[in-house]
C-alpha cells in the first residue's frame, strides 16, 4: 500500500487516469435483468463509491469514515486521523452545485472540538450524464471548505433554511466568472467568522454564541500550537456582498 496526499490523488486522477476523458456507465443487475441506469440523481453517490474502489485497486492507503453525517469520507493517514482528510462531492455540471457541506449545528459543534476538520480537502467531480446513461467527468476540483462557500442574503453563510429552521451548509458557485455573484470566502478566518455569526443568528444555536469564538480559538491553539485570530463578522461582511 502507498500513502498519497489529497493533492497527489487529484494529480493522479488528472494526469495518469485522464479522468476528464474517461467514459462510464452505471449498470444494475437483478436476476436475469441488466440495465443501464439513466437517473442523474444517483451519480454522485456512485462516484464516491467508485473512488473508494479506485483507491483499493491502485493500492492507495485509506480508511472509510463511519460517520456519514460529517466530513470526511476518507482518512488518507490511518495512523493520524487529524491529517489528510478527504471528502468527495459530485454534482451535475449542467446545473449549480446541489450537494450539502454538512449539517450546520453538527458542524459548528464539531469544529470547536476538532478544528482540524476545517482542513478537510474536498475532491469535487462535475459530471454529465447523457440520455443513454453515459457518464463523463467535465471538471475536477480540489478545494478547502472556505473556497467553496459564501454568504447569502440575511445570513452570514449560505444555508438551507426551511420554515425558518436552519439545516445544511450549502456551497456557492466557486467556478463562476459572474462578478455579480456573491464571492467565496477569502480565507479560513473569514469562513469561521461567518460560522460564529450564524451560531448567533440561528435560534437553535444562539445559546452557544457568547463563548463559541473563544472555545474555537482555544481548541485551534491547543491542536496546532499556534494562535488564530477570528475577526467579527461586522468587520468583514462588506467583502462578501453582491457587487
UniProtKB/Swiss-Prot annotation:
The keyword Acetylation does not apply. Its EC number is 3.1.21.4. The keyword Nuclease applies. It comes from the Bacteria. One of its GO terms (biological process) is DNA restriction-modification system. Transmembrane segments: none annotated. It catalyses: Endonucleolytic cleavage of DNA to give specific double-stranded fragments with terminal 5'-phosphates. It is an enzyme of class 3 (hydrolase). InterPro entries: Restrct_endonuc_II_NlaIV. Keywords: Endonuclease, Hydrolase, Nuclease, Restriction system. GO terms for molecular function: type II site-specific deoxyribonuclease activity. This is Type II restriction enzyme NlaIV. It comes from Neisseria lactamica. The gene is nlaIVR.
